[in-house]
Amino acid sequence: MKLNMRRLGTSGIEITTVGFGSWAAGGGGWAFGWGPQDDDASIRAIERAVSGGVNWIDTAAIYGLGHSEEVVGRALSGMPAADRPLVFTKCGMDPDPADSYRPPTRKASPAFIRIEVERSLRRLGVEWIDLYQIHWPDETGVPVEDSWGEMGRLVDEGKVRAIGVSNFSVELLERCERVRHVDSLQPPFSLIHRGSGSTVIPWAAAHGTGVIVYSPMASGILTDSFSRERVEAMAEDDWR
């Protein structure tokens, strides 16, 4: 199947207008999990999406405390190199080792970003990451300029091809842009949550920054399968 393509901002990366989000593939057992998942079913879903023309997968180090990246890595390892999709992942969320259900600390220090990228490369089984994103703004006192400078160094070193942010405000985007161009922005956006459409998305359009929204189906609420019965049957560790 031939899907429509778009260039991701000025990065030169061409992506399909539909991608594969692997938050749920991380499974349960952590603060924002989707309950128990079948890894083999997740891999089959990835393979089905790629065979249908999707050319990128989005994941994050925090999803399942690294498990989502491992599942994506398994899926990639079973594909011929020429058929593998682009890989996008995120950093900057530090889980509590004593309590996996405690919301992770939003931490984007240069040292932690460096640790996270190496872990992600290993779990994904890739030599570089096509798009590396700061998941949330730092809450530990690290200036965003320091975080963004480290992201730029990862590009210069060839560990990542493009860099982006998720959940950033216009003010933070402006500060990043003064250090190095923001290749991509990933805000929440759906028929229910439209706030980004009047704030950060116009900023991105004006600055040549690509936009990949997350939760466009509002975590399942906008699908025709999200019934009262399904909600009642959800696992206790499904954050929804």
Where are these regions (language model features)?
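N-terminal binding-site loop/beta-alpha segment at the start of enzyme catalytic domains
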Residues: 1-86
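Short, acidic/polar
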Residues: 35-49, 108-124, 167-175
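Active-site groove signature of glycoside hydrolases
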Residues: 121-140
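Conserved, mostly hydrophobic/aromatic
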Residues: 8, 20, 42, 57, ...
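Acidic (Asp/Glu)-rich catalytic clusters
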Residues: 10, 75-86, 121-125, 155, ...
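Active-site mouth loops of central-metabolism enzymes
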Residues: 27-40, 99-114, 139
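Generic structural signal for well-ordered alpha-helices
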Residues: 5, 46, 69, 73, ...
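Beta/alpha (TIM)-barrel catalytic core signal, keyed to glycine-rich beta->alpha loops juxtaposed to Asp/Glu
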Residues: 137-240
